[in-house]
Amino acid sequence: MLEEIKAQLRAHCEVMTALQGELSPAIESAVSLVVDAYRAGNKLLVMGNGGSAADAQHFVAEMVGRFKLERRALPAIALHTDTSILTAIGNDYGFDRIFSRQVEAHAAAGDVVVGISTSGNSPNVQLALELAREKGCRTVALLGKDGGSIKSVAELPLIVPSNDTPRIQEGHITIIHIICDLVERELFLKGN
């Protein structure tokens, strides 16, 4: 058992090393998109399924509440948190439309819409990102494996280089924390 624990920790470290090298420029671009949107008076909309929904909700909580700094709330919406909306849309339009219908209702040009999918193949996330781009939103996708079908839809795909879902999720939450930290610094510590 001890060897398995060490193996999993090594795998985690390998993913973090890959983020530091391969994905750092893309993470910087994601931070810039979010900062620019907030400076322009826009908002952040985030979505995912299962564990990715938990990560999306965490991201939104850090923006609306705070990450590290005492500051004003930043507008952000997690698109999976209202069970009445989800079940109404799912029942009337199908599960694939649960996010796109909300993007239709809430997203405006200049907003940043973030989709999270460890496989990169979640149809409901893909449809929402496609609609968001049509509406003039900036789109970011946190993905894993080979990026799946979503990598070609998102303006900025951030693909965690792993095929192991837990490692991908660890990469996603690390990226989210970096974005939250740097967005706060850019907006509230640099006097902008």
From Swiss-Prot:
<dbReference type="GO" id="GO:0008968">
    <property type="term" value="F:D-sedoheptulose 7-phosphate isomerase activity"/>
</dbReference>
<dbReference type="GO" id="GO:0008270">
    <property type="term" value="F:zinc ion binding"/>
</dbReference>
<feature type="binding site">
    <location>
        <position position="177"/>
    </location>
    <ligand>
        <name>Zn(2+)</name>
    </ligand>
</feature>
<feature type="binding site">
    <location>
        <position position="62"/>
    </location>
    <ligand>
        <name>Zn(2+)</name>
    </ligand>
</feature>
<feature type="binding site">
    <location>
        <position position="62"/>
    </location>
    <ligand>
        <name>substrate</name>
    </ligand>
</feature>
<comment type="similarity">
    <text>Belongs to the SIS family. GmhA subfamily.</text>
</comment>
<comment type="pathway">
    <text>Carbohydrate biosynthesis; D-glycero-D-manno-heptose 7-phosphate biosynthesis; D-glycero-alpha-D-manno-heptose 7-phosphate and D-glycero-beta-D-manno-heptose 7-phosphate from sedoheptulose 7-phosphate: step 1/1.</text>
</comment>
<feature type="domain" description="SIS">
    <location>
        <begin position="34"/>
        <end position="192"/>
    </location>
</feature>
<dbReference type="InterPro" id="IPR050099">
    <property type="entry name" value="SIS_GmhA/DiaA_subfam"/>
</dbReference>
<keyword id="KW-0413">Isomerase</keyword>
<dbReference type="InterPro" id="IPR035461">
    <property type="entry name" value="GmhA/DiaA"/>
</dbReference>
<keyword id="KW-0479">Metal-binding</keyword>
<keyword id="KW-0119">Carbohydrate metabolism</keyword>
<feature type="binding site">
    <location>
        <position position="122"/>
    </location>
    <ligand>
        <name>substrate</name>
    </ligand>
</feature>
<dbReference type="GO" id="GO:0005975">
    <property type="term" value="P:carbohydrate metabolic process"/>
</dbReference>
<dbReference type="InterPro" id="IPR004515">
    <property type="entry name" value="Phosphoheptose_Isoase"/>
</dbReference>
<feature type="binding site">
    <location>
        <begin position="91"/>
        <end position="92"/>
    </location>
    <ligand>
        <name>substrate</name>
    </ligand>
</feature>
<dbReference type="GO" id="GO:0097367">
    <property type="term" value="F:carbohydrate derivative binding"/>
</dbReference>
<feature type="binding site">
    <location>
        <position position="169"/>
    </location>
    <ligand>
        <name>Zn(2+)</name>
    </ligand>
</feature>
<feature type="binding site">
    <location>
        <begin position="117"/>
        <end position="119"/>
    </location>
    <ligand>
        <name>substrate</name>
    </ligand>
</feature>
<keyword id="KW-0963">Cytoplasm</keyword>
<comment type="subunit">
    <text>Homotetramer.</text>
</comment>
<dbReference type="GO" id="GO:2001061">
    <property type="term" value="P:D-glycero-D-manno-heptose 7-phosphate biosynthetic process"/>
</dbReference>
<feature type="binding site">
    <location>
        <position position="169"/>
    </location>
    <ligand>
        <name>substrate</name>
    </ligand>
</feature>
<dbReference type="InterPro" id="IPR001347">
    <property type="entry name" value="SIS_dom"/>
</dbReference>
<feature type="binding site">
    <location>
        <position position="58"/>
    </location>
    <ligand>
        <name>Zn(2+)</name>
    </ligand>
</feature>
<feature type="binding site">
    <location>
        <begin position="49"/>
        <end position="51"/>
    </location>
    <ligand>
        <name>substrate</name>
    </ligand>
</feature>
<protein>
    <recommendedName>
        <fullName>Phosphoheptose isomerase</fullName>
        <ecNumber>5.3.1.28</ecNumber>
    </recommendedName>
</protein>
<dbReference type="InterPro" id="IPR046348">
    <property type="entry name" value="SIS_dom_sf"/>
</dbReference>
<keyword id="KW-0862">Zinc</keyword>
<dbReference type="GO" id="GO:0005737">
    <property type="term" value="C:cytoplasm"/>
</dbReference>
<comment type="function">
    <text>Catalyzes the isomerization of sedoheptulose 7-phosphate in D-glycero-D-manno-heptose 7-phosphate.</text>
</comment>
<dbReference type="Pfam" id="PF13580">
    <property type="entry name" value="SIS_2"/>
</dbReference>
